[in-house]
């Protein structure tokens, strides 16, 4: 399951012709919503991207996998995403302030997951 969402985001951005660095922030928004495990939060985030019914269904299935995987799965993948963030082209594309906001968001997700 590790990297599933990252792979999905990279495939989608490649398909749409976007630079992957431009898709970093939208990826973090979607990843955060999926990992939080709350369908309402996921719906709000997906609405920003005008997701189709099939796309919503796919993201809901990924969210179910994370929920089934439990706390350990969510924390491990959040840590992987953090490491990718601080060692990726995203870091060079966005300002330091934006990267700090993303890092803060990932830490907030971890705190929320841990209760």
Swiss-Prot record:
Where does it localize?
Answer: Secreted
Q: Where is the signal peptide?
A: 1-23
Keywords, in A-Z order? Secreted, Signal
- Primary location group: secreted
Q: Which Gene3D superfamilies match?
A: 1.20.920.50
GO CC annotation: extracellular space
Give the record's family classification.
Answer: Belongs to the secretoglobin family.
In its UniProt entry, what is this protein called? Answer: Androgen-binding protein homolog
Q: Which organism is this entry from? A: Mesocricetus auratus
